[in-house]
Regions:
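Catalytic or ion-coupling anion/metal-binding cores of large enzyme and transporter domains
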Residues: 1-184
Length: 184
């Protein structure tokens, strides 16, 4: 166990609840693109923390509140990402609870309906071979969303003040996916 355990600095190094819910927050549009599962030892951590702080101020100045970002469509996107990553089953409790806070009803049938059309794309422990930080280095949530974008609502708003579709296009234009290829 000592040699094969799931070692990590930060959140769990497997697709447990903490890792899954970071990914769900980003998939809902509530985190900056590409920031979920950033390893605690990453040189980019401070930069992304500053960007998140600046973006929080921008969101307040522009009155872009979570209730203007989180919709049924954004939950459907998150559930599709959940299927693609084979996320923690605890999400079946957490996502409906979060949705309820926004006046949105999600139940097991919602997961079942959306998961039936989804593809499993990840090889992350415990169902797969690799630790969770590899997901981050391989492009994280944006890479998964790019792969399944035909199944997503690209018109949903995000914390960037742009739609999901605009975020994915900007990442592609800026070469985000190019730096991730060596991990895929």
């Amino acid at each position: 166990f000592v040699h094969d355990g799931f070692h990590s600095c930060g959140a769990c190094s497997f697709m447990g609840t903490a890792s899954t819910m970071q990914i769900m927050a980003e998939a809902l549009g509530l985190m900056l693109p590409g920031s979920a599962l950033m390893p605690a030892t990453s040189k980019d951590l401070r930069t992304v923390a500053r960007e998140a702080g600046k973006q929080s101020v921008w969101l307040a100045e522009h009155d872009l509140t979570p209730d203007k970002i989180v919709t049924m469509k954004s939950f459907e996107n998150a559930i599709m990402v959940h299927a693609a990553i084979s996320g923690s089953t605890n999400s079946l409790l957490h996502l409906p609870a979060i949705a309820r806070e926004f006046g949105i009803e999600i139940d097991g049938d919602t997961f079942d309906r959306l998961h039936r059309g989804a593809h499993y794309l990840l090889n992350i422990r415990p169902a797969g071979e690799w630790p969770a930080q590899f997901f981050y280095y391989a492009g994280g949530v944006p890479t998964i969303m790019e792969e399944i974008k035909d199944m997503l609502h690209l018109d949903v708003m995000t914390v960037t003040g742009k739609t999901l579709g605009e975020n994915l296009e900007e990442l592609k234009k800026n070469g985000f996916y190019d730096k991730c290829d060596s991990y895929l």
